[in-house]
């Protein structure tokens, strides 16, 4: 199984001004494309912090995806932080420069705009269909790093445009869930372990939807990865059925 990590960069996230929806979107996207997302980082706009996040993420990941810090301002330093991490210098990339010129038309190429065309040699730019700063796909010792803007619409559009570079053809992810009523999470907890032992390779997570001791209701989510999509789906569906059986055994009811 391939592992991935997600890095989001920005002081605005850490101080709570901006809700980190990018991490959720990227994590979901990677999971459904066959990756086990191992780690998530949120770091401030600081070269050392950014470089540290990439370095630690690359230790455990086949793919690292970052968002934020690609713009023209002084605190947009993700590319520089990544370059520092891998020991490369930034240089003007002609393809990236052409993308920037196309976006700004007759406007002057100020140092701030030119900054967005400076990338490490191991990266190639991907045109941003929504904004100005190109996204980057980088190769690092057999691993892959994708660097995206922080504006959600730009990030989402670029990530989808890079789908062919991300997808793992021989790995599938599937999940399903069942809602059970009148069973407390603490009462169902032993059966979570039992289901995971009975159906090897799946993950079972209980999500409380109400107060534990007053009208308890749980969503039991079951997920897994596998090479055989049909077999994986059947395993998950069988495990869902078993969860329902245990709920009834505990005096509850299945709402799904």
UniProtKB/Swiss-Prot annotation:
InterPro entries: CinA, CinA_Arc, MoaB/Mog-like_dom_sf, MoaB/Mog_dom. Pfam families: MoCF_biosynth. Gene3D superfamilies: MoaB/Mog-like domain (3.40.980.10). It comes from the Archaea. PANTHER family: NICOTINAMIDE-NUCLEOTIDE AMIDOHYDROLASE PNCC, NMN AMIDOHYDROLASE-LIKE PROTEIN YFAY. Belongs to the CinA family. HAMAP family: CinA_A. This is Protein Ta0487. It comes from Thermoplasma acidophilum (strain ATCC 25905 / DSM 1728 / JCM 9062 / NBRC 15155 / AMRC-C165). The lineage of its organism: Archaea, Methanobacteriati, Thermoplasmatota, Thermoplasmata, Thermoplasmatales.
